Amino acid sequence: IPRTPVFSPLTGQDYQQMAPYFDYIFPKHYYWHRGFDGLYGTISRWVERLGAWNPSLTQDDCFAVVESLLGIRLPGVESLLDLERGHTDEFFDRVVYDETRRALEGIGDPAKVIGWVSTGRGPHGGDQMPPGALSGILQAAQASGLERFLYHPEPDFGAAEWLLISSLCGKVWDENPKGYWPTGTDKPDAYNGGRQAPEEI
């Protein structure tokens, strides 16, 4: 389960060289902030660390060094504070798309590639990404040619995540509390004093 190709020069994970040794390769689609392994969090830590080690560098300088190391520029990110504002549509369209495409091309066989998707939480300690970001990741990855993914919720799926994923993978979930209900979201009668929802649908 390697990190996305942007980290390959620094982690020594060569997609082309590892492809013959594995039946499947699961590129980590980890883009959250804070915690560990997430792209935003990693870039933030490196910018902060470079600034601490080199007090004469401005934040702009530190971002420029990290961008040079990784060969990537985050759309809409000019400062550490910008990382707190979440991911732009352009981030998904450019960064997620390009990283997925690079993994697919490096491995050379889309049937061997399964995107390992997570949106923060435990065990990584990252800021939870909203369902719209999950949708952005999945849509951009699919547009780049990814055929399969594995979603790693921690600890449980929420209703919005399940609805988004089911809409991409066959039959859209029927959000009916009397049927399947994701454990990561309380049923409607759990937060209204136990009153049953009216039979309107």
List the predicted regions and their residue ranges.
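Glycan-processing catalytic domains of CAZymes
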Residues: 1-201
